Amino acid sequence: MRNFFKAISSGSLLVVSLVHADVGREEELDEAVRQFAAKVEAVWKECLRRPDVHTTHDSDMCLLTMVRTANEKVELKYQEKMADALQMIEHPDRFSSYEQVPVLLKASQSQWKEYVKLDCEGIYQMSVAGTARSGYSLLCQYKHAVHRLRALDEWF
């Protein structure tokens, strides 16, 4: 009976250690995304302070730069994850050949792009009568890109 309790205690300690290590990884990844967003947003705010930025169109151009930077980061991270997924195929194990991983990652990325397009177009259409409609849509795209960075981190 004593050995049984020792085994349970040892197993619990191992599980807690693994969960703690994963939480540490999650926190590091979250922090990296937060730092990226803070840096990009600081550049956007600096752009808005420029003396030649006067109109809604001018401020939208600053926002568009932020969206492009975020989308480039998403594409880079996606390509890194795809390279990892393709490498998994080269090293199958007794559990899986991993052939579906790149297929699913590609589908996930494609569907994410379609979702962002529809979601942000909806926001644009809701505010179509106003001058800030493009800004709302661009901000929507930026927020989705930052969220996607975090989501791609889930693809080990």
Segments the model singles out, each with a brief description of its role:
Residues L13-A21:
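Hydrophobic h-region of N-terminal signal peptides that target proteins for export
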